[in-house]
């Protein structure tokens, strides 16, 4: 492995590369296009390469790994303190070379193409959900301007609106009926796309042994299991379960001064989409907590609910689900409700 460390500041068309030797002296300083960068990395002796996480960083990291380099992805907020003087692309690249060599630096795990595919499907589905909600609100708002009220929910829109648009005495002008048909057609196509994406995620979860094992955890279904796998893989980058819980942002924020610890609300750091799914799964268990009081998790939740607010109890349960998911991923076993020793959610 070469002693030179490369820091690359990524862009859409231009990439700024700074190389430093073991003493920290700059030995390379280049502004390159995409093809030129790939040629440089293919010809350069294997070395440590630092890249800030951004759009396209995962792809380039996999390419550079294929050339034999040791590639590390750094969160942008961890690089910023190393930027000296004015902010420009070369200074950013040099800051990356300094940050990547720190032994205590925290890196972003590299994702496989399969993980990126599942993550892209989740993001596209989330976009379609937002689009469906926006269309629903717009249709209801336009009709309310004409004195027509439709109940909330997708079912009412799906069943009431088609008949309303066909009625001659509905109070809608011909132009409004035509516009309503156009918006309803867009809504139906969006709904069909969401169903197709859901079917694809179900198929992926059935094909993945890890997803099937994760779904043995109470509160974890198709969406959450596939989202976990796409985000963290087999969780090998997390040494302990609490590290994964902290990465998801489901641990209390700590503010300690003068030796007096003080815990605040959850940090809400990391993957907000994954955190939301864990909280939704915890809320599903919260609804059924009184139905199965002998269940160990439900029994623990009932006892916690007697001492804490419902929202706090739900977040605590979501934290527990994250830890259980880590144990299932690292152990290679399914979740066993009555297994209290051995692989614990946190050691």
Where are the predicted features?
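A detector of single, family-specific signature residues
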Residues: 1-347
């Amino acid at each position: 492995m070469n002693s030179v460390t490369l820091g690359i500041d990524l862009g859409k068309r231009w990439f700024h590369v700074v190389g430093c030797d073991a003493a920290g002296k700059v030995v390379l300083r280049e502004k390159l296009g995409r093809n030129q960068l790939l040629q440089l990395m293919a010809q350069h002796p294997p070395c440590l390469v630092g890249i800030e996480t951004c759009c396209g960083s995962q792809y380039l990291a996999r390419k550079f790994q294929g050339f034999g380099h040791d590639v590390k992805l750094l969160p942008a907020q961890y690089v910023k303190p190393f930027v000296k003087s004015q902010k420009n692309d070369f200074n950013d690249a040099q800051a990356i070379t300094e940050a990547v060599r720190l032994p205590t630096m925290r890196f972003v795990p590299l994702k496989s193409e399969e993980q990126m595919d599942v993550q892209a499907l989740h993001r596209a589905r989330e976009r379609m959900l937002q689009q469906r909600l926006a269309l629903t609100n717009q249709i209801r708002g336009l009709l309310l301007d004409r004195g027509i009220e439709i109940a909330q929910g997708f079912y009412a829109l799906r069943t009431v609106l088609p008949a309303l648009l066909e009625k001659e005495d509905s109070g809608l002008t011909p132009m409004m009926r035509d516009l309503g048909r156009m918006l309803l057609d867009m809504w139906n196509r969006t709904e069909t796309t969401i169903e197709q994406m859901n079917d694809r995620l179900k198929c992926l979860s059935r094909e993945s042994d890890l997803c099937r094992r994760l779904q043995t955890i109470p509160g974890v279904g198709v969406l959450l299991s596939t989202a976990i796998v796409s985000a963290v893989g087999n969780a090998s980058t997390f040494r302990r379960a609490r590290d994964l819980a902290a990465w998801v942002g489901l641990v209390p924020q700590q503010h300690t001064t003068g030796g007096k610890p003080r815990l605040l609300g959850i940090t809400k750091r990391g993957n907000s989409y994954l955190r939301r799914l864990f909280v939704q799964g915890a809320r599903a268990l919260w609804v059924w907590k009184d139905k199965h009081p002998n269940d160990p998790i439900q029994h623990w939740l009932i006892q916690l609910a007697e001492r804490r607010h419902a929202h706090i109890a739900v977040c605590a349960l979501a934290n527990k689900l994250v830890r259980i998911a880590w144990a299932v991923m690292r152990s290679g076993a399914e979740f066993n409700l009555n297994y209290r020793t051995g692989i614990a959610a946190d050691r």
